Amino acid sequence: AWDQRIEFVNQNGMAALAAPTVERWCSGGFHASGSAKLDEMRAMVSATPATGFIGCARALQGLDYHRRIGEISARALFIAGSDDNATPADNMRLMHADLSGSEFVELSPAGHLSNMEQPEVYTETLRSFLG
């Protein structure tokens, strides 16, 4: 998927990537709400320099969260959106299972940017974890 997005940006620019990216990041209910945050997210993606996006995409292509997750000794909290198409909640559950002592919270309804869709619940979850 990353190679296709990189090629798309090279051919069409970041503005053309904004709508499909935000579509993938957010839950259907959030889209249906017509929140002004959707326009803010599209503007953010559009304003991202193509070279920055491509560099991040290349970095994410080879990222393997599971390979060394057991080496983490710090407390960890996994927050997943129930409707996250970018990093599905099941993937987060696997990481949680692989990291002893970690905590897992699924926010619903929420997509990849659960902090934008459920800001109060997300913030309270984080505050509670941090103590």
Locate each region found by the language model.
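Hydrophobic, aromatic-rich cap/lid helix
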Residues: 19-20, 38-67
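Short, surface-exposed alpha-helical segments at coil->helix boundaries
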Residues: 3, 35-39, 89-93
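Short beta-strand/loop motif that positions the catalytic acidic residue
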Residues: 72, 78-80, 84
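Catalytic active-site module of serine/aspartate enzymes centered on a nucleophile-bearing elbow/loop
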Residues: 101-131
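Hydrophobic "lid"/C-terminal helical patch
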Residues: 21, 57-60, 95, 122, ...
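Short alpha-helix in the alpha/beta-hydrolase fold that links the catalytic acid
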Residues: 74, 88-97
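Glycosyltransferase donor-binding loop in the core domain
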Residues: 9, 45, 84-87, 111-117
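Flexible "cap/lid" loop of the alpha/beta hydrolase fold
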Residues: 1-20, 24-25
